[in-house]
From Swiss-Prot:
Catalytically driven reaction(s): UDP-N-acetyl-alpha-D-muramate + L-alanine + ATP = UDP-N-acetyl-alpha-D-muramoyl-L-alanine + ADP + phosphate + H(+)
Biological process annotations from GO: cell division; cell wall organization; peptidoglycan biosynthetic process; regulation of cell shape
Coiled-coil ranges (or none): none
PANTHER family found in the cross-reference section: UDP-N-ACETYLMURAMATE--L-ALANINE LIGASE, UDP-N-ACETYLMURAMATE--L-ALANINE LIGASE-RELATED
Protein origin, superkingdom: Bacteria
GO cellular component terms given for this protein: cytoplasm
Organism: Synechococcus sp. (strain JA-2-3B'a(2-13)) (Cyanobacteria bacterium Yellowstone B-Prime)
Family membership noted in the UniProt record: Belongs to the MurCDEF family.
EC category: ligase
Record's keyword annotation contains Zinc: no
Protein name from the UniProt record: UDP-N-acetylmuramate--L-alanine ligase
């Protein structure tokens, strides 16, 4: 049941000093914490609650944000404006109390829109690649000295978090399509990386997804989009297109592409003229496409290609995007947020560049997604040598009868010779070391809590190889 809609007047400015106190219900989330950070950095009184503390809440506390662990109406000190996200249910005691008292209540997307739409906004939308692309654009503007404000859906070391408050003209925001709220933004430059069905809990079918992106594109003063995506090319009116495959209508193209285990290199062409060479530390064709979007945006803003290329050459990626977690006993451990079949394929293709045995460890995210895309999931692990599947992270959804993750393991095994099912996530550190071999690349895939088992697995594998001197390269797990 959704929270009752409370349309806010367009003239209501969230930065009005008379509206200076905010309380975020679910402040530890990546999107909520970013907005809380932006407001706190501007001197507004901010508080928030969540079930558990995390690195993001601790970062906010260092700014003076008051954090309440757990949800209680006692957190509504001084009748603040209350901010919630689609993850918060109407029965939440804080949200229910705020509605009962008639407090100003913002959906996160409404607050973002109220801040973003008043500025020169660059909004990055798409089913895949939003975090990396928005981070790349932000890094380019930061490197160019433009001092942008950044609201990103992931942690980035370059600005030590998921948000940055700048004094420059431009705001760069990752735009979430999961609940349809992307249609609330009106960017100066809108970016769409691709369009697929990824949130069947909100959209009935792909047609609904396409219509939401069409509206977002129409609301963008300039739409920059990837013409390699069939749904983009067929259904959107694109102002500035980019392509890795030579699409004839793409103003920006990557040619003479070289993918290696340590870098990606390509010639970048603009409207038929060679701009120069681009070299990236982040790997894979998906990241080259993301970088090409950043090139297109930078050029629309008037930046010289040399400035853009220099910044992108230094960009090291966002957390949980093929993030190197460590090496133990000759095994390299990688954390990646991929949770859609297309993302899994792209990540494993990048892993294959290492020319090592690839062990893919996958935690499905949301029962509804697994059910809607089941056959695609069953066939997306072709680049892995070994596939290990753990139980689905439900994200609050009711579990179906039986184990959908076990059914997935059986289905993957119809297309793949080496599949292992682990029936309990806490058992993974006990089971996975027996699968691993020196030289392996262990890639943990998923948007849930699988990543919390990586360090424990590294410790367990270190213990296993401790009797074999010379193998453990990082024996810092006692």
């Amino acid at each position: 049941m959704p929270v009752p809609s409370q349309p806010l007047p367009l003239h209501l400015d969230p930065l009005d000093p008379l509206l200076s106190t905010y309380h975020f219900v679910g402040i530890g989330g990546v999107g909520m914490s970013a907005l809380a950070y932006i407001l706190a950095k501007q001197g507004f009184r901010v508080s928030g609650s969540d079930i558990v503390a995390n690195g993001r809440t601790r970062r906010l506390e260092a700014l003076g944000v008051r954090f309440f662990q757990g949800h209680s109406s006692e957190g509504l000190v001084g009748d603040p404006q209350v901010v919630y996200s689609s993850a918060i249910r109407p029965t939440n005691p804080e949200l229910a109390a705020a509605l009962g008292k008639g407090l100003t209540v913002w959906h996160r997307a409404d607050l973002l829109a109220a801040l973003f739409n008043r500025r020169s906004g660059i909004g990055v939308a798409g089913t895949h690649g939003k975090t990396t692309t928005s981070s790349m654009i932000g890094y380019v503007l930061l490197s160019a000295g433009w001092d942008p404000t950044l609201i990103i859906g992931g942690e980035v070391d370059a600005w030590d978090g998921n948000a940055r408050l700048g004094k420059g003209e431009y705001w760069v925001a990752e735009v979430d399509e999961s609940d349809g709220s992307l249609v609330r933004l009106y960017p100066k430059i809108g970016v769409i990386t691709n369009i697929e069905l990824d949130h069947p809990d909100h959209y009935a079918d792909l047609g609904q997804v396409i219509r939401a992106f069409q509206q977002y594109g129409q609301q963008s003063q300039t739409l920059v989009a990837c013409l390699d995506c069939p749904n983009v090319a067929a259904h959107l009116r694109v102002d500035v297109g980019y392509s890795l495959t030579g699409h004839p209508q793409a103003q920006y193209q990557a040619r003479q592409i070289l993918y290696t285990a340590s870098f990606t290199c390509a010639e970048i062409w603009e409207k038929g003229s060679l701009l120069g060479q681009l070299r990236l530390q982040v790997l894979g064709s998906h990241n080259l496409s993301n970088a090409l979007a950043a090139v297109a945006v930078g050029r629309q803003l008037g930046l010289e290609f040399a400035v853009i290329a220099s910044a992108l050459a230094q960009f090291r990626g966002a957390h949980r995007r093929f993030e190197h977690k460590g090496e133990v006993g000759g095994v390299t451990f990688i954390d990646d947020y991929a949770h859609h079949p297309s993302e899994i394929r792209a990540t494993l293709q990048a892993a294959r560049l290492q020319q090592r045995r690839v062990v893919a460890v996958f935690q499905p995210h949301r029962h509804s997604r697994l059910a809607a895309l089941f056959q695609d999931f069953a066939r997306c692990f072709g680049e892995a040598d070994v596939v290990v599947i753990v139980p689905t992270y439900g994200a609050g959804e009711p579990a179906p009868e039986g184990s959908d993750s076990l059914r997935l393991a059986v289905a993957v095994a119809e297309h793949h010779p080496h599949v292992r099912y682990v029936s309990s996530l806490p058992q993974l550190p006990e089971v996975l070391p027996s699968v691993l071999q020196p030289g392996d690349l262990a890639v943990f895939l998923g948007a849930g809590d699988l990543n919390q088992q990586i360090i424990a697995t590294m410790r367990a594998y270190a213990a296993q190889v401790r009797e074999q001197p010379g193998q453990a390269k990082n024996p810092n797990f006692s």
